[in-house]
Each structure stands twice: as structure tokens, then as C-alpha cells.
């Protein structure tokens, strides 16, 4: 049986980390939304050979157990004692190592596909619990809806859908090491966000007021190594973006606009120094 799942990119409307757990991992307090920039993940099961294979159209991704999609298939197959082999084909459109959760979204797509193929009958919340064993972003990617995400990434509160907005997603030709950025966090000096105010306005469906409270506490840490991220963000603001900020640990910067025409204007204006630019809708 063959199933194809859409695996959208995620954006951090807010990203904060209140503390570090005893194991050294950050506690997250984030508001996340998905964007219509997506990979397409085709999953096929077969009796022979009883192996897991991953194929992608990107030379930057591993095709073995280092790939999160591979891990998703392995974990689900082991947990439910399924003996089928699994072939995963990923058509990449989300930039790799960009802070957009592409690998996590691919893994979530594999979990959803195999849940359907093997008729496991797992709810989204049950899939999300399994997803947490793969990576902290995978539980959110099971849902792909506007949500407040806390803890290790396992606590997910879905929020009311927002008006139709456009996003300009731009990735410069730089690579950011997430572990390197997370090691830079000094919790005594971190400038925390007012996520409570952001959530209040999102729940009232007052998007314009909510934009005042969006942000990413990791921006200064990443920009210390890559100041060009700050220059791109400022350029987007100058061009009229409602919001412009970094997603995840970077390097991707996104702008949110209430009209497609403004989003296109920003896209055309920054293409000269940033070729990987997409205009998409928020989901």
C-alpha cells in the first residue's frame, strides 16, 4: 500500500526558553504555525525485503538511521511489531538545516502514513507522544496547526485559526549549528517574551495586536555569529512586513504580510542577495 503525506514547514511566531532541564535540554515556550512550503513524503510498505529505505531528491540529507523519517518508521514498526519493509521517498522543497523543521515534518508525515497503512487507529495525540521520542519538533508537526507548544515539545494547545496571511520565507547561504546556539544561552541575561499577551490576543483573534508580542529570544545569539540575519530582518521590516524574525535557531528569516502584493514586493526586493525566497500562505 502507498500513501503520500504533505509535510509543511513550521515557523516560530514566538520562541522562548524559560529554563534548562536537569538533563541540559531547554524547556520551550513557543507559538508555532505551519506554512504552505512543504515536502511530499510517499510511504510504501512491502513484505520483502523487510528493510527500511529512504530516498530523497536532496544530496544534503542522510538516507540511513540518521534521517528522522527513517527513525519514525523504525520506532513505529518496532512498537507495534510490524514485519513489513518500508520505502520512504521524500520530495524536498523545504530548505535543509534552515530552522523550518523540515526533517521533523517528514518524520511526522511518516508516522501519519504508517498509522493509516497499518490501520493502527492511533489518535493524533497518541502519535504525538510517539513523535516526542524522535525530536522535540515532531509532536507539533503531527498537527501542523497554530499552537502553543511547551515543555520538551510535548504539551500542545491548539489555537483558533487566524485570518489569511502571507509569509515570505528567506534562507541565506549560511548554515547554523543548533547545538552551538543552544550552548550560548545564558538564562540570567535572556530577554524573555510576553507570550501570555501573545496568546491572549491570538485567542481573541486579534492578529494585529498579537504581532506586537511575537519574537525569538535566540535571535541575538545567532546574529552574534551571523549578523547578515539581522540585516535581512531589518530589510524586510523596511519593506513593510507586519512581522519579520528568525525561525528556530536560524538561519531562515520570515516576514508576515496581510496582503500578497506586499509579500511579493518583499520577495522581489531581497532576491538580489538571497536567492532561496518563497512566498506562501500560513496554514
Swiss-Prot record:
Transmembrane segments: none annotated. NCBIfam families: ispE. It catalyses: 4-CDP-2-C-methyl-D-erythritol + ATP = 4-CDP-2-C-methyl-D-erythritol 2-phosphate + ADP + H(+). The active site is at residues 10, 137. Coiled coil: none annotated. Belongs to the GHMP kinase family. IspE subfamily. Catalyzes the phosphorylation of the position 2 hydroxy group of 4-diphosphocytidyl-2C-methyl-D-erythritol. Its EC number is 2.7.1.148. Keywords: ATP-binding, Isoprene biosynthesis, Kinase, Nucleotide-binding, Transferase. It comes from Limosilactobacillus reuteri (strain DSM 20016) (Lactobacillus reuteri). Pfam families: GHMP_kinases_C (PF08544), GHMP_kinases_N (PF00288). One of its GO terms (biological process) is terpenoid biosynthetic process. It is an enzyme of class 2 (transferase). This is 4-diphosphocytidyl-2-C-methyl-D-erythritol kinase. GO terms for molecular function: 4-(cytidine 5'-diphospho)-2-C-methyl-D-erythritol kinase activity; ATP binding. ATP binds at residues 95-105. Pathway: Isoprenoid biosynthesis; isopentenyl diphosphate biosynthesis via DXP pathway; isopentenyl diphosphate from 1-deoxy-D-xylulose 5-phosphate: step 3/6. The keyword Ion transport does not apply.
Amino acid at each position: 500500500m502507498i500513501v503520500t503525506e504533505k509535510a509543511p514547514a513550521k515557523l516560530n511566531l514566538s520562541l522562548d526558553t524559560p529554563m534548562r532541564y536537569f538533563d541540559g535540554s531547554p524547556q520551550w515556550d513557543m507559538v508555532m504555525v505551519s506554512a504552505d512550503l512543504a515536502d511530499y513524503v510517499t510511504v510504501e510498505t512491502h513484505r520483502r525485503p523487510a528493510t527500511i529505505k529512504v530516498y530523497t531528491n536532496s544530496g544534503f540529507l542522510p538516507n540511513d538511521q540518521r534521517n528522522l523519517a527513517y527513525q519514525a518508521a523504525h520506532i513505529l514498526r518496532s512498537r507495534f511489531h510490524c514485519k513489513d519493509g518500508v520505502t520512504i521517498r521524500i520530495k524536498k522543497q523545504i530548505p535543509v538545516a534552515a530552522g523550518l523543521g523540515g526533517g521533523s515534518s517528514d518524520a511526522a508525515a511518516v508516522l501519519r502514513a504508517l498509522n493509516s497503512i497499518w490501520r493502527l487507529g492511533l489518535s493524533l495525540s497518541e502519535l504525538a507522544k510517539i513523535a516526542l521520542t524522535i525530536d522535540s519538533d515532531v509532536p507539533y508537526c503531527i498537527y501542523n496547526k497554530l499552537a502553543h507548544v511547551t515543555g520538551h515539545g510535548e504539551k500542545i494547545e491548539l489555537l483558533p485559526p487566524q485570518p489569511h496571511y502571507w509569509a515570505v520565507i528567506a534562507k541565506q547561504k549560511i548554515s547554523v549549528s543548533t547545538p552551538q546556539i543552544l550552548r550560548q544561552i545564558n538564562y540570567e541575561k535572556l530577554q524573555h517574551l510576553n507570550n501570555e499577551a501573545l496568546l491572549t490576543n491570538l485567542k481573541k483573534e486579534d492578529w494585529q495586536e498579537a504581532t506586537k508580542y511575537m519574537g525569538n529570544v535566540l535571535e541575538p545569539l545567532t546574529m552574534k555569529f551571523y549578523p547578515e540575519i539581522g540585516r535581512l530582518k531589518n530589510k524586510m521590516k523596511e519593506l513593510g512586513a507586519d512581522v519579520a524574525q528568525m525561525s528556530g535557531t536560524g538561519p531562515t528569516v520570515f516576514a508576515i504580510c496581510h496582503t500578497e502584493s506586499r509579500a511579493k514586493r518583499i520577495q522581489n526586493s531581497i532576491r538580489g542577495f538571497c536567492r532561496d525566497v518563497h512566498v506562501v500562505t500560513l496554514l
